[in-house]
Amino acid sequence: LDLIDLHIKTVQAEQYARKYRHPVFLHMKTVRLMGHAGSDIETGYMSLEELSKIERQDPLLFSARILMDNKCLRSSDINNLYEECRKRVSKIFEYASSRPKLIDSDEIMSTIVSNVSNTIKPEIPKQIDRKKIFGKEYSRLDKKYHMAKLINYALHDILMQYPNTVIFGEDVGKKGGVYHVTADLQKNFGSRRVFDSPLDETSILGFSSGFGHNGFVPIPEIQFLAYFHNAEDQIRGEVATLSFFSKGQFTNPMVIRIPGLAYQKGFGGHFHNDNSLAIFRDIPGLILACPSNGSDAVKMLRAVTKEAHKKGRIVVFIFFLCLFLVIDLHNPKDNK
């Protein structure tokens, strides 16, 4: 591995990606130094000649040769630099080893949720701004509607109140989602804040993590609850562990919207109805919301968005599909 050539090519790749907004792949040859673990005895399956050849390609030694060949450093300079680094690492290791250990469950769990709060408090949208955004719908806001419509209204308000929110997912843009929950959002707020994603749940949650790292509060949609399980490790292994592993220094907030649970009559298929909630209850620090009616859904959606913005919380918001378009909630013609 030629580190100088790698640096040059990486800078070129970065410039290309920024200019043309295209992905860039770096194709390089690497070597495998030493075994995978202490029990991996390389001499059991590789000859001494093979091991020696690999060691001669050690990037550290190769880089040292480049520096000497180009008269950047002498061998004694490189040895001194190596020894200084070794001593510094040893000193830091000794210091880290002497630090107090975590002694109880409270200490261990203290950073599952970050204690850092966002002090910026977005103002509630003014009525004149709401009237402009909602247009003809403004005069209908006080009427009773099913859950899907009420959530749509709530998302309009959230996008107005929190300028750092973005909404994305499969067909959530111009189409407005399968159940029109995101209808007119792209028209009213533009394609930079409301946009379609690839048909890939891993990418959707990966995008969300990246947005969260950069000061946004993403509100992604996973089209059906069963689809989440294709990408659950993005949340379990990456997103939800960030605060814990960084000692509360970093967060990547998000509000993941997922329709699921009991389905509309006549629609089947395990890829839509495999509704396991156990995965969410097994992830420390995650907020799981599941409203039973449209009015509660609006209040809860506002509340969890505030938690995500202020405290960097990770939220999974499950909507009952069977209630999305229901008007008579408890009894026939009750219009609740």
Regions found by a protein language model. Give the residues of each.
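Thiamine diphosphate
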Residues: 109-314, 322-324
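Conserved phosphate/pyrophosphate-binding and hydrolysis machinery centered on Walker-type P-loop NTPases
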Residues: 82, 102, 175
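Glycine-rich ThDP/TPP pyrophosphate-binding loop and its adjacent helix/strand module
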Residues: 1-98, 281-336
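Ubiquitous "structural anchor" signal
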Residues: 43, 79, 104, 185, ...
